[in-house]
Amino acid sequence: MDKNIGEQLNKAYEAFRQACMDRDSAVKELQQKTENYEQRIREQQEQLSLQQTIIDKLKSQLLLVNSTQDNNYGCVPLLEDSETRKNNLTLDQPQDKVISGIAREKLPKVRRQEVSSPRKETSARSLGSPLLHERGNIEKTFWDLKEEFHKICMLAKAQKDHLSKLNIPDTATETQCSVPIQCTDKTDKQEALFKPQAKDDINRGAPSITSVTPRGLCRDEEDTSFESLSKFNVKFPPMDNDSTFLHSTPERPGILSPATSEAVCQEKFNMEFRDNPGNFVKTEETLFEIQGIDPIASAIQNLKTTDKTKPSNLVNTCIRTTLDRAACLPPGDHNALYVNSFPLLDPSDAPFPSLDSPGKAIRGPQQPIWKPFPNQDSDSVVLSGTDSELHIPRVCEFCQAVFPPSITSRGDFLRHLNSHFNGET
């Protein structure tokens, strides 16, 4: 019994399972068919809408053609018939025939108008709604576009006005530089660049510092750069108001009188010394008197220029007085000068003379300048003027004249000493 029941249950389960599978397959097939049908329906609806639009276009074209044909048929043929009949009439025909002909012409004209009017009404009714709808849409889009373009134009104009108010032209900074001659194409520009200015008395030999700042320097480095450049004779490029710098004029030396006087004195000294070596002291004194040059000033200037210049055949005129030998000289020979001549050499090439050699002095910044007090050290007497010098009376070593500081000045004392050299005493 149990086996039979189990077999029956298995069969029933298999049948139920098969029925469920058939149901599922039927449902799936139904879904696929419905989807296919819906897709076909959509495609057919699209085709119908497309065909409807084509039909509407064809109807509109047909209405336009019919309207043109009706206008031509209603006006032109009637005129032709009336004109031909009127032209064919003769004066011999009776008046009644003319009246009857006109009446005949009016009858077909009225009939044609009655036939054409229902056609126009039907065409307007059939195609009036789609044409009016399309025309309304076109007009609406046109006016929308026109309004949008008008807004864009107004906005662009407002932006232009606002930018023109905000746009301030920047003033270009003028750079201080010289324009070469070959870069100017017009003659008036060249003449304007090289026109002589009012500042013609500027000494080109002296070091000049312009307001041109070197490139790559900050504001805090500008002062130090000027201090370093002030030690040299640096020539900066000319500015617009200083174009005379480009003229090919010979430069004037900074100090003319001492250089020329020393050159003349040197030539005359060499000639006189070769002719008569014994009288070279007097010759040198007369040369200084002829040129009108202070020997002390010439000697000091010569000492200052020894480190800056390098002449080849000049003579170092080192002026020395005989203050320490004043007791041995007669009273009238105080104007004699002893000139020690040595060829001027470069400090690197010149041999170092011994300190014990008489009549020679070591060149360089350590060389002492002539002092009216030979017995004192160089540190105790300073020509620049100190507080101790203001209270010490000055005594002339030539004539033993006393110059108290309360009455006389340092300039008076120096002029008195210069009078001894020029032979005024």
Curated annotation (Swiss-Prot):
Positions of region (Interaction with TBK1 and IKBKE): 133-172
InterPro entries: CALCOCO1/2_Zn_UBZ1 (IPR041641), TANK (IPR039669), TBD (IPR024581)
Residues under site feature: Cleavage by EMCV protease 3C: Q197, Q291
Any coiled-coil regions, as ranges: 22-62
Recorded consequence of changing H247A: No effect on cleavage by Seneca Valley virus protease 3C
A Pfam family the protein falls into: TBD
Annotated binding of Zn(2+), by residue: C396, C399, H416, H420
Tissue: Ubiquitous.
Ranges where the record places region TRAF family member interaction: 172-191
Annotated phenotype, changing D188A: Diminishes interaction with TRAF2 and TRAF3
GO process annotations (BP): cellular response to interleukin-1; cellular response to ionizing radiation; cellular response to tumor necrosis factor; defense response to virus; DNA damage response; negative regulation of canonical NF-kappaB signal transduction; negative regulation of tumor necrosis factor-mediated signaling pathway; positive regulation of protein deubiquitination
Reported effect, E251A: No effect on cleavage by Seneca Valley virus protease 3C
Intracellular or extracellular location(s): Cytoplasm
Record region (Necessary for interaction with TRAF6): 70-191
Site ((Microbial infection) Cleavage): E272, F273, Q291, G292
Annotated region (Necessary for interaction with ZC3H12A), positions in chain: 1-31
UniProt keywords, alphabetically: Acetylation, Coiled coil, Cytoplasm, DNA damage, Host-virus interaction, Metal-binding, Phosphoprotein, Zinc, Zinc-finger
Taxonomy, superkingdom: Eukaryota
Effect the entry attributes to changing Q266A: No effect on cleavage by Seneca Valley virus protease 3C
An example molecular function term from Gene Ontology annotations: zinc ion binding
Post-translational modification: Phosphorylated by IKBKE. (Microbial infection) Cleaved by encephalomyocarditis virus (EMCV) protease 3C. This cleavage allows the virus to disrupt the TANK-TBK1-IKKepsilon-IRF3 complex, thereby inhibiting the induction of the IFN-beta signal pathway.
Assembly notes: Homodimer. Found in a deubiquitination complex with TANK, USP10 and ZC3H12A; this complex inhibits genotoxic stress- or interleukin-1-beta-mediated NF-kappaB activation by promoting IKBKG or TRAF6 deubiquitination. Interacts with IKBKG; this interaction increases in response to DNA damage. Interacts with TRAF6; this interaction increases in response to DNA damage and recruits USP10 to the ubiquitinated TRAF6. Interacts with USP10; this interaction increases in response to DNA damage. Interacts with ZC3H12A; this interaction increases in response to DNA damage. Interacts with TBK1.
Name this protein carries in UniProt: TRAF family member-associated NF-kappa-B activator
